[in-house]
Amino acid sequence: MYFSQEEWELLDPTQKALYNDVMQENYETVISLALFVLPKPKVISCLEQGEEPWVQVSPEFKDSAGKSPTGLKLKNDTENHQPVSLSDLEIQASAGVISKKAKVKVPQKTAGKENHFDMHRVGKWHQDFPVKKRKKLSTWKQELLKLMDRHKKDCAREKPFKCQECGKTFRVSSDLIKHQRIHTEEKPYKCQQCDKRFRWSSDLNKHLTTHQGIKPYKCSWCGKSFSQNTNLHTHQRTHTGEKPFTCHECGKKFSQNSHLIKHRRTHTGEQPYTCSICRRNFSRRSSLLRHQKLHL
C-alpha cells in the first residue's frame, strides 16, 4: 500500500506510525513465507531510515503484467516464466501464509519487465497450509485505514458515560455507578461488627483490620503503629514535611492526595455532595453534614 505526497500529508503522526508498523510487519510476513526472493522495497528502506515513504505517483497493483512497486520476485529456476500480480495472490489473514487454494491469474507474457513477479510451479502449494479467512493483498489499504480509525478512537479514550451531577465522564458504566455514590452518599458495604458503612469495598476491608487489632506497620520516628502500609507512609510525612501533591493551578502543595482533591474544588467550583432533602450542593462532606443538621 502506497501514498502520494498529498495523501501522506493528510495523515496525523499516530496514523503514520501505525502505517510504519503495518508495512514492516507485512514485509516480514512475506519474507517468512520463503516463497519470494526479496530485494528490500524502497518504501521499507525509507521507513527504516525515518524518511517519508510517499511516492510520486500512487501505484496500484494490477491484474496485468507490469512493474510492481514492491520489487518482489518469486523464486525461479527457469527462464520461461510469466509475471503474476501480487494482488492475485490470496493470503490467509489470520495466519499470514499463502493458502493451498491460492488463486493465481497468469496474464500474457511480457518480457523484459523489471520488478515483477515470476511464477514458479503454480498450484504446488504445501497441502498442510490452512485455508480459512483468506484476504487479498489488494484490500490491505482498506484494512489499514480501518485499523487507523479504530486505533485513533482507542487513543482518544472516549468516555461516553457522563455524571449528570458534576459532568465528569467515564469509559465504562461501572465506574460511573461507583462515582455516583459520592453524590448520593450511598454506602452499600457494611461492617458486621460495628454496623459502620462504607462507599467502597476496599475501605471496608481496611476498616476490618481495626477490629482485629493488627497493626504491623510501625513509624520509626514516633513508634505509632498502623494497620495499613499506606497509612504509615502518609503519617511519616508529618515528620518529614514532604508534600508531594501539587496543585497545577496555583502551585500549592499538600501532604495527602485527598487534601489536594478538596483544594482543587476551590478552582473548579465542583460541589459533589448533595443534600438529599433540599438538593443543595456542597464542595466538602463536612459542610454537607453541618447543613443537614438544619433539617433535623
Curated annotation (Swiss-Prot):
A zinc finger (C2H2-type) spans 161-183, 189-211, 217-239, 245-267, 273-295. Changing Q228E: In a breast cancer sample; somatic mutation. Transmembrane segments: none annotated. GO terms for molecular function: DNA-binding transcription factor activity, RNA polymerase II-specific; RNA polymerase II transcription regulatory region sequence-specific DNA binding; sequence-specific double-stranded DNA binding; zinc ion binding. One of its GO terms (biological process) is regulation of transcription by RNA polymerase II. Residues 1-66 form the KRAB domain. One of its GO terms (cellular component) is nucleus. Its main location: nucleus. InterPro entries: C2H2-ZF_domain (IPR050752), KRAB (IPR001909), KRAB_dom_sf (IPR036051), Znf_C2H2_sf (IPR036236), Znf_C2H2_type (IPR013087). It is found in: Nucleus. Coiled coil: none annotated. SUPFAM superfamilies: beta-beta-alpha zinc fingers (SSF57667), KRAB domain (Kruppel-associated box) (SSF109640). Keywords: DNA-binding, Metal-binding, Nucleus, Repeat, Transcription, Transcription regulation, Zinc, Zinc-finger. Belongs to the krueppel C2H2-type zinc-finger protein family. May be involved in transcriptional regulation. This is Zinc finger protein 75A. It comes from Homo sapiens. The gene is ZNF75A.
